[in-house]
Amino acid sequence: MARTKQTARKSTGGKAPRKQLATKAARKSAPTTGGVKKPHRYRPGTVALREIRKYQKSTELLIRKLPFQRLVREIAQDFKTDLRFQSHAVLALQEAAEAYLVGLFEDTNLCAIHAKRVTIMPKDIQLARRIRGERA
């Protein structure tokens, strides 16, 4: 872009310049807290985006194994008592459950974005399941 000569313009009002002398003096005379540093905080959303990138790169299971195993055994009790599970069977169930949940949350996020929101809500999950045909 070509440079143009700046010409002086007459001010038409606006904000008056702030007086900083009093605030600077008050800041200098204020007692320090003995070098106690505030803990560092990231801006809202920064950590969330970092976690999204981290978990999208990873392939490990996100639900802890033992709590998931207890849940499977608790649900299986309703169908038949004294059932035994091979460890690979529980792992296969966990892989399938996590894959289902990740896909559901992806669809849920799309529903929230479609509604011009960034926060997912229960109604987004219900809509995603309804569109998938899982719930009438």
Swiss-Prot record:
Modified residues (N6-methyllysine): 5, 10, 19, 24, 28, 37
Keywords of this entry: Acetylation, Chromosome, DNA-binding, Methylation, Nucleosome core, Nucleus, Phosphoprotein
UniProt GO cellular component terms: nucleolus; nucleosome; nucleus; plasma membrane; rDNA protrusion
Alphabetized CDD domains for the sequence: HFD_H3
N6-acetyllysine modifications at: 10, 15, 19, 24
Transmembrane intervals: none
Record PTM N6,N6-dimethyllysine, positions in chain: 5, 10, 28, 37
InterPro entries, per the entry: Histone-fold, Histone_H2A/H2B/H3, Histone_H3/CENP-A
N6,N6,N6-trimethyllysine, modified sites: 5, 10, 28, 37
Annotated spans, Disordered: 1-43
One term of GO molecular function: structural constituent of chromatin
Protein name: Histone H3.3
Organism name: Arabidopsis thaliana
